[in-house]
C-alpha cells in the first residue's frame, strides 16, 4: 500500500463531504455501475466531488484495502463509506440517499 496514495485518500475523504470514487467522470462514466451510481446521485441534486480511479492507478490499488471494500464505485459521505452501486441504488429507491446527502451538505453550509 503506497503511503502517498493513502495520505491522498485520507485528505480527499476528509475535505469532501460527499465523495464518489468511480470509473470515469459524472459526465462520462466508464462502467455501468459508475453510471447507475451517478444517476442516483444526480437525481438527488447535491453537489459532490469525484475521483476517476482509472486516471489514478495508485488510488485504485490502495483504496480497497483502506476502505475494506473491494469494488468501485465507492460513495463516501462525511468521512464514512456508504457503499457501492447496489447499496446506493437501494438507498436511492427508499429515499434514504436523498436524506443522507441533504444532511451531509447541510453540515458544511455556514
Give the ranges of each region predicted by the language model.
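Thiol-based oxidoreductase modules, predominantly thioredoxin-like and allied folds used
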Residues: 45-61
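N-terminal leader/targeting and pre-domain segments
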Residues: 1-19, 109-110
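Acidic beta-strand-to-loop metal/phosphate-binding motif
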Residues: 21, 74-78
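Thiol/disulfide oxidoreductase modules built on the thioredoxin-like
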Residues: 65-71
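Non-catalytic, surface beta->alpha helical segment in thiol-disulfide oxidoreductase systems
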Residues: 77-109
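Structural motif corresponding to alpha-helix initiation and N-cap regions
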Residues: 2-6, 56-60, 94
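Local sequence-structure signature of Cys/Sec-based thiol-disulfide redox active-site neighborhoods
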Residues: 10-47
